[in-house]
Amino acid sequence: MEEFLDKLPQMDLMRSEKMTLVQLIIPVESAHRSITYLGELGLLQFRDLNADKSPFQRTFANQVKRCGEMSRKLRFFKDQIDKAGLRCSPRLEIEPDIALGDLERQLADHEHEVLEMNSNSEKLRQTYNELLEFKIVLEKASGFLVSSNTHAIGEEIELHESTYSNNGFIETASLLEQEMNPGHSNQSGLRFISGIINKDKLLKFERMLFRATRGNMLFNQTTSDEEIMDPSTSEMVEKVVFVVFFSGEQARTKILKICEAFGANCYPVPEDTTKQRQLTREVLSRLSDLEATLDAGTRHRNNALNSVGYSLTNWITTVRREKAVYDTLNMLNFDVTKKCLVGEGWCPTFAKTQIHEVLQRATFDSSSQVGVIFHVMQAVESPPTYFRTNKLTNAFQEIIDAYGVARYQEANPAVYSVVTYPFLFAVMFGDWGHGLCLLLGALYLLARERKLSTQKLGSFMEMLFGGRYVILLMALFSIYCGLIYNEFFSVPFHIFGGSAYKCRDTTCSDAYTVGLIKYRDPYPFGVDPSWRGSRTELPYLNSLKMKMSILLGIAQMNLGLILSFFNARFFGSSLDIRYQFIPQMIFLNSLFGYLSLLIIIKWCTGSQADLYHVMIYMFLSPTEELGENELFWGQRPLQIVLLLLAFIAVPWMLFPKPFALRKIHMERFQGRTYGVLVSSEVDLDVEPDSARGGGHHEEEFNFSEIFVHQLIHSIEFVLGSVSNTASYLRLWALSLAHSELSTVFYEKVLLLAWGYENILIRLIGVAVFAFATAFILLMMETLSAFLHALRLHWVEFMGKFFNGDGYKFKPFSFALI
C-alpha cells in the first residue's frame, strides 16, 4: 500500500506552492531599482524587519511623506477636473519616465497656478454676483418706492439715508457720492433699506425685523426672476428682494445688524427714476465686462487642467509605485556600514530563478560595482499559503478563503469545490428552465468580460461579475439536475421518449385516485413525466430526493476524511492516521455508510423494506430477526459486527493518541531518542508562525490539555456524524420547496389567468408569473441555495480535514496597488 501511494503523482493543484525564505543584501545605489524590478515581477513577499520602529523613525520616512504630499496634489487636480466637468483621456503615446524630484516641482507649479486662478475666479464671481444682485434690486425695489413727495428734499433724505452693508458693491460708491448730499439730513422722516436675501431665510428674517422694531416697520418683498450662483458651493440659489420702511436712527442700526446676521446684502436704490436708469446702465456695463473676463478665465483654467489631465493617470501610477517602493525599502534594515540594505522575504520556490535574474538586471542598469547577494535561508516559521489560480478557479478559491486560509501545504478544498459546489447547488435548484435563465445571465457576463473588467462596477454587479464562472457552472449543473427531475418551470416534458405508464381507460378519470399502470420499460433518463399529477407524486419524489441527499452527504463526508488521511500522510503524522483517520472512517461507515448501502440495495432490488425500522432496531434490538425488512442474506450478523465496530471506534479515537504523545515526549526528554517531533504530532493547534518540519517545538507538554482537546474532538465527531448527515437533508428540503413554488406559480397564477378570455387578465397573469419567477425563484431561491451549499462545504465537508489557520501570500507587486 505504501509503495502504491508513493508512486502516485504529485498533486500540484491540491496543495499550495512550496515557499522559500530568502535574504537580499542590496547595495544602496541599486536598492531603489532592485525593489522596483521586484515590484514589477510581483513574486516576493517582504518581511518587516523594522516592526519595532514607528513610521517616522524609518530610513525613508521623508520620501514617503513627499509621495503622500504629491498624492494629495494629484487628488486635488482630479477633483478640480471632475468639478469642471472635463473629460481628459490619457495620452496614447508612451511618456518617458520622470524623476520624482522633477514631478514634485511640476506638481507644485501646477497647483500654485490652479490655486491662483481659483482665487481670482472666486473674487470675480463674488463681484459678479454682487453686481447681479444690485441689478435685480434696482429692477424689483423701484416698484415699492412710489411716493407722493418727489421734491428735492425727499430725494436728499432718501439718498442720504439709503445704506448698504460692508459686503456691498464698493465700485458704485463714486456714483452714489455724486447723488447724495452729505450736508443735509432729516432725522425724523421716513427711511428705507433695500436688499436681497436667500428665500429659505426670508420667514425668520421678517419675523426678527418685526420683533426688533416692535412692529414699527413696513416690509415688502418680491421674488427675483433669476437664480444666483453661490461661489462657495457652485449651486444656484433662489433669492428674494426686500424693502424695509422705518423711521429713526435706532431702528436703522437694528435693521442693519439683523441684515448682517442673516447674510442679507443691502444695496442703495435712488428714488429718482432717472438716476435708477443711469445706475442700471452702469451696472449692466460692468456685468458685461465681468462676464467676458470670467469666460476668459474659465477657458484659461480649463486649458491648464486639460494639460494636467492628459498626464494625470500616469502621474498617479508613478506616485503610487514610488510610495510602494519606499514603503518596502522601509521594511529593510540598514547595514551598520550604511552601504547596503538587508531584506528578508518569502517567494515561491519556482520563482527563485526569475528573482535572481531580475536582481542581476537591476545591478547592471544602476551601474553598481557590487551585485545583489541573494541566498536561501533556513525557514523557522510557517510559510505563507500561495495558490496559483486562473479566472475559473479564483472565485472558488475566494469562497474557501472567506472561511479560512489553508495552512501551508494543506489539502486545498477549492479543487474539489469547483465540481461539488455547483453540483450541490443544482441538487437544490434543479429546474432546467431556471437553469437556462442563469446560463443566459452567465453568458452575458462572459461576453462582456473584457469591457466590464475595465469599468468601475457597483458592489452587487462587481460580486456577480467576479463569480461569473461560478454562475456558469451552477447553471450547467442546474440544467443537468433539472433534466433528471424532468422540470421546466415545473412542467415535465417527454424529452427522452414516451412514458412507461398509461391510464387504465381512455378517459383517465381515475388516474389520480386509482393510479396508472406500467406497460413498457422505464423512462430512460430522469423522472418519468407521468409522475406529474399522480396520487403518488409527492411520496415518490420525497423518497427519491431524501435518499439521494443522504447518499451525496455520506460520499462528500467520506471525501473529507480521505483528504484528512492525505494531510496526515503528507505531514508525516502517523498518529493521526492510526488513531484518528481509521476510527473515524470505521464509525462513519459502520452506521451511515451501511445506511447508504441499504438505500442502494433497496433501489436495485425493489424491496419494500422499511429502512427506518432497520436502523432504529439495529441499536434497540440488534439480535432480533429482521423478517420482511431483510434485504440480503447475512444482514443481521453484519449489523451486529458494524455496531460493535462503531462502539469500538469511539474509545479508539479518544484514548490512544494522548497517551502516545505523552510516551513520545517522555522518551525524547529521557535521552532514549533525539528525533525531532513533527509539530502536528505535538500540538494539535499549530499557529501560523510556528515551526514546521525544521524547528524544535519548545512549548511545555500539557497532557491534561491534550487529553481534553482529544475528548472534545472525539465527541464533536461522533455527534457531528449524526448532525452532519441530517444537515444534508437540506438538499431534499430546498429541492422540494423550489419545485412546489414553481408549481404554485405555474398553476395558480399562469394557468389560472390563462383560463379567462379577457386579454387584460392574461397579460396581468403573465406579468405576475414573470415577476415571481425572476425575483423569487431566480434571485431569492438562487441566493438561498447558494448559501446552503456554502454551509455544506464549510461545515460538513471542510470540517473533516481543513484547519484553515494559515495566512495568505501577499507579494510586493505593482499590479496589486
Curated annotation (Swiss-Prot):
Its main location: membrane. Belongs to the V-ATPase 116 kDa subunit family. GO terms for biological process: proton-transporting V-type ATPase complex assembly. Essential component of the vacuolar proton pump (V-ATPase), a multimeric enzyme that catalyzes the translocation of protons across the membranes. Required for assembly and activity of the V-ATPase. Required during cell expansion. It comes from the Eukaryota. Keywords: Coiled coil, Golgi apparatus, Hydrogen ion transport, Ion transport, Membrane, Transmembrane, Transmembrane helix, Transport, Vacuole. Pfam families: V_ATPase_I. It is a multi-pass membrane protein. Residues 1-422, 490-547, 602-639, 780-817 are cytoplasmic. V-ATPase is a heteromultimeric enzyme composed of a peripheral catalytic V1 complex (components A to H) attached to an integral membrane V0 proton pore complex (components: a, c, c'', d and e). It is found in: Vacuole membrane; Golgi apparatus, trans-Golgi network membrane. One of its GO terms (molecular function) is proton-transporting ATPase activity, rotational mechanism. One of its GO terms (cellular component) is vacuole. Disruption phenotype: Lethal. Residues 97-133 form a coiled coil. Signal peptide: none annotated. The chain crosses the membrane at residues 423-443, 469-489, 548-568, 581-601, 640-660, 759-779. The keyword Transport applies. InterPro entries: V-ATPase_116kDa_su, V-type_ATPase_116kDa_su_euka. Residues 444-468, 569-580, 661-758 are vacuolar. It comes from Arabidopsis thaliana. This is V-type proton ATPase subunit a1.
